[in-house]
Amino acid sequence: MDGCIDWSVDLKTYMALAGEPVRVKCALFYSYIRTNYSMAQSTGLRLMWYRNKGDLEEPIIFSEVRMSKEEDAIWFHSAEAQDSGFYTCVLRNSTYCMKVSMSLTVAENESGLCYNSRIRYLEKSEVTKRKEISCPDMDDFKKADQEPDVVWYKECKPKMWRSIIIQKGNALLIQEVQEEDGGNYTCELKYEGKLVRRTTELKVTD
């Protein structure tokens, strides 16, 4: 696309487990320009999406069944490993053109686990410190009028938390971290009949 201002690849990476829904948002509206999708549309700008295939950018045909375009985002209703890659959004009219790419990684669960190590989040804490583990990147799955009903697991198993570990909204608060608190924490949310999971590895140091 000649004459297009190219912001290359945005720093935010999207991650999902196979079978989960995921929304890839056009980063232009969040980090690069001072306008939103509705305002851009009203001034005659068009938003187009492309999938990066090597050096080529192929226009995306939205099937609506598995993938649809919704305002400034692509909704993958049920992401698959083959969806991993780079997606470019282009905002343009006859005199203006700007684009940026977003990275999506979709991975299968590892055998016998509820997560894939490649798409874990990482948190660190020292022993005896207070630590809050959030359930990241869940904003797209929240209903405006209610707190999401999040369930937490450790090493993929339900756990009776000791008294100083408290679930606070969609986060888990460890009021005094112990060495045994290190490990993998998975938060789970039901959305339109599907499960959405995020796993955070907590590393505890002395």
What would you call each of these model-derived segments?
Residues L11-A16, F62-T95, Y121-S125, W161-G193:
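Extracellular beta-strand/loop-rich beta-sandwich domains predominantly from IgSF
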Residues A40, F86-E110, A144-P148, N184-D206:
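Extracellular/luminal immunoglobulin-like beta-sandwich modules
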Residues C4, C26, W49, I74, ...:
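Disulfide-bonded cysteines in secreted/extracellular proteins and peptides
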Residues T43, E70, K129, Q146, ...:
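Exposed loop/turn and edge beta-strand positions of beta-sandwich/beta-sheet ligand-binding modules
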Residues D2-I5, K25-S63, S134-R162:
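N-terminal V-set
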Residues C4-V9, E110-Y121:
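Proline-enriched interdomain boundary motifs that mark the N-terminal boundary
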Residues S117-M138:
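Compositionally biased low-complexity segments at domain edges in trafficked proteins
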Residues L17-R23, A27, A107, S125-R130:
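Solvent-exposed, conformationally flexible loop/turn segments
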